[in-house]
Amino acid sequence: MSKRKTKEPKVENVTLGPAVREGEQVFGVVHVFASFNDTFIHVTDLSGRETLVRITGGMKVKADRDESSPYAAMLAAQDVAQRCKELGITAIHVKLRATGGNKTKTPGPGAQSALRALARSGMKIGRIEDVTPIPTDSTRRKGGRRGRRL
């Protein structure tokens, strides 16, 4: 009888994120969508095609009413920053967005605290841009001819 051949397990060295030289910044794009119901923080590569991290305020708190709160946005932003550092992203461009269209053009309550938490986490911030969709000629707003009566 011959000895049974056993394969030794190969150890693969896996690195996350791009290969960069020392002292070079690796940029990602942080899309912050802050409505009055929730805050989405979505990190992509520079082209915007590949999602790296996506965390919402609703993933951080239990109560539905707290999804859009500044506290939930801050927790989400801290998680995003930690994950970005693991992936090797050291600098970010921020694209801030409100609901827009024929709805409100002002960002929700979580926008400012999310941005502040990203800045305090040690990420370098390149550009901050408002990408709220502003209609040039829109569909009719809801509320009827005489508007919303309080």
From Swiss-Prot:
GO biological process terms, semicolon-separated: translation
Domain of life: Eukaryota
Main location group: cytoplasm
InterPro entries linked: Ribosomal_uS11, Ribosomal_uS11_CS, Ribosomal_uS11_sf
UniProt subcellular location: Cytoplasm
Pfam families per record: Ribosomal_S11
Keywords for the protein's UniProt record, in alphabetical order: Cytoplasm, Ribonucleoprotein, Ribosomal protein
Gene Ontology cellular component annotations, sorted alphabetically: cytosol; ribonucleoprotein complex; ribosome
Alphabetized SUPFAM superfamilies for the sequence: Translational machinery components
Gene3D superfamilies: Ribosomal protein S11 (3.30.420.80)
Gene Ontology MF: a single term: structural constituent of ribosome
PANTHER family per record: 40S RIBOSOMAL PROTEIN S14/30S RIBOSOMAL PROTEIN S11
Similarity remark: Belongs to the universal ribosomal protein uS11 family.
Protein's recorded name: Small ribosomal subunit protein uS11x
Source organism: Arabidopsis thaliana (Mouse-ear cress)
Gene behind the chain: RPS14C
